[in-house]
């Protein structure tokens, strides 16, 4: 009787159930809030750079002392920025800063002095233009300083491609090669104006399936396929390793899921808007983060799929132990869930955080997590990096 009952209980356990763990207690909690934390970069001396595009500030934090100083200032000139959105480690202790408002990439040296700038976008977005449009909004930078971006995949007025390339750019704007191709998010497109004064608006469909990807320090690229939830590692030496598909339950998108998605978009700064204006042959491009959130009353303004894809779109973070942290979609109100995969594509662990919290980066033996309060203000916490 007991054996029969025990067998029945085992049958009821889902085949894809995972043992879950937490990160434990934080080793440091920064006491002051941020408008939104776009990205973090741990400096060699242990300080942490934080780009806050909504507060329009670049901070250097001492997590242990609980202090911060502003690096640079707001403006359009040298040592200035508008909407600092991302910070990435470069060789020699330098840092790459994404300055959205000024449409440029800025290099800071090891002393955090502003060195030089380059435009985010180059090329011609029009069909049959002189050169293809390249928009350098980094998803990752490897230890050699190669920058990785997702190709735009559409010219101004051209068709919307279902898949695009992951581009590796040597020296920020030198040789470009395509590492892999990924499925992109579904969109809704609208156009206005005439041939010489034309506007195109492309709006992503929330929670539509999209491959996610990231880069390890050695330049290996990991792609998470949204169709069957499997990983592919594209090695810097040209080799490819494919992991087995992971079982998953596709979460039905109800009102609660829609509200949670829009709230998360708002507290994380929303998406990046790219504006392209062509007037009398002159091309102007602008970049801005914000406006991605929405109230419950705005839910019906969007097209929604019936179910969530298995994974979050965007960047897959790779930790110092060469493990990919993949955020998995769950029902509204459930803990934030990260599946951790090794270089062979095997699932090795599952980590959960409080609902809505997200992993933002890694440092020397640590994980940085963004926590939100009831007012959607951002706080930065540091945890020990789990070894298994």
Q: What is the predicted role of each segment?
A:
Residues 2-13:
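Bacterial N-terminal signal peptides
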Residues 16-388:
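Eukaryotic scaffold repeat domains enriched in small/polar residues
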Residues 1-2, 18:
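Accessible peptide chain termini
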């Amino acid at each position: 009787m007991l054996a029969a009952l025990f067998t029945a209980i085992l049958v009821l356990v889902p085949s894809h159930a995972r043992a879950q763990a937490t990160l434990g207690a934080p080793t440091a909690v920064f006491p002051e809030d941020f408008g939104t934390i776009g990205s973090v970069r741990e400096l060699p001396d242990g300080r942490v750079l934080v780009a806050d595009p909504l507060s329009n500030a670049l901070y250097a934090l001492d997590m242990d002392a609980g202090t911060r100083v502003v690096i640079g200032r707001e403006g359009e000139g040298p040592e200035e920025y508008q909407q600092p959105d991302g910070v990435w480690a470069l060789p020699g202790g330098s840092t790459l800063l994404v300055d959205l408002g000024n449409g440029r990439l800025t290099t800071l040296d090891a002393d955090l002095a502003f060195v030089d700038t380059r435009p985010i976008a180059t090329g011609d977005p029009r069909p049959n233009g002189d050169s293809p449009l390249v928009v350098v909004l980094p998803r990752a930078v490897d230890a050699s300083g190669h920058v990785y971006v997702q190709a735009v995949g559409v010219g101004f007025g051209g068709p919307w491609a279902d898949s695009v390339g992951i581009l590796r750019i040597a020296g920020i704007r030198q040789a470009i090669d395509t590492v892999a191709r990924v499925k992109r998010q579904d969109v809704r497109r609208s156009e206005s104006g005439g041939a010489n004064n034309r506007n195109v608006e492309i709006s992503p469909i929330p929670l539509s399936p999209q491959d996610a990807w990231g880069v390890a320090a050695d330049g290996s690229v990991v792609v998470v396929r949204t169709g069957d939830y499997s990983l592919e590692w594209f090695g810097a030496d040209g080799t490819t390793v494919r992991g087995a598909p992971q079982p998953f339950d596709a979460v039905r998108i109800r009102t609660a899921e829609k509200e949670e998605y829009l709230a998360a978009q708002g507290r994380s700064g929303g998406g990046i808007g790219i504006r392209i204006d062509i007037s009398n042959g002159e091309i102007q491009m602008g970049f801005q983060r914000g406006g991605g959130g929405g109230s419950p009353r705005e839910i019906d303004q969007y097209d929604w799929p019936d179910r969530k894809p298995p994974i979050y779109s965007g960047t897959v973070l790779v930790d110092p132990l060469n493990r990919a942290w993949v955020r998995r979609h769950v029902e509204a109100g459930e803990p934030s869930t990260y599946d951790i995969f090794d270089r062979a594509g095997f699932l090795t662990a599952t980590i959960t955080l409080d609902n809505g919290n997200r992993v933002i980066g890694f440092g020397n033996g640590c994980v940085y997590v963004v926590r939100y309060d009831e007012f959607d203000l951002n706080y930065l916490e540091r945890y020990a990096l789990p070894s298994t």
